[in-house]
Amino acid sequence: PILLTRNLSVAKSWIRSHARGTERYGMVAASGAQRLKPYAIDVRFNIRPKDWFLNGPTDTRSSWYLEDVATEFHIQGLELDWVLMTWDADLQYSRSGWKYRKFRASKWMQVKNEERQRYLLNAYRVLLTRARQGMIIFIPEGDSADPTRSKELYDPTFEFLQTLDI
């Protein structure tokens, strides 16, 4: 199954409730997802992939804790049974096609270089194909008090994914 939510707590509960026995689960995000920090998702924190993938459920560094997030660089070529995919405003759906952005200091900047656009799209492709059994996609509600996380940055992507019956 693939589900879609705007509530990170719901996403974490769903992932935990579906994993059985030794099935592995974890949280992933694109390396450019800079504005998920208000949710304690910081892609700049460099996980140790060995600890994240191999350590057990009692180790806070492991994927089991759903605290440290793996990016496309950490997870490429590897799979988890269940994935909590976090989606930021670096890749936004619009009626005219995808909008590609990079966060710099205090605002989102448009990515105009086609090669960098392909890289960003491929980062999301990598992340969206890491789950063996199921996935839940978390897209934030947005915050009208924060122009770097406004609802307008997140709503179009959420609404588009809803049309796909996710």
Feature names for model-found ranges:
Residues 1-97:
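Conserved helicase/translocase motor-coupling segment
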Residues 65-166:
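C-terminal accessory regions
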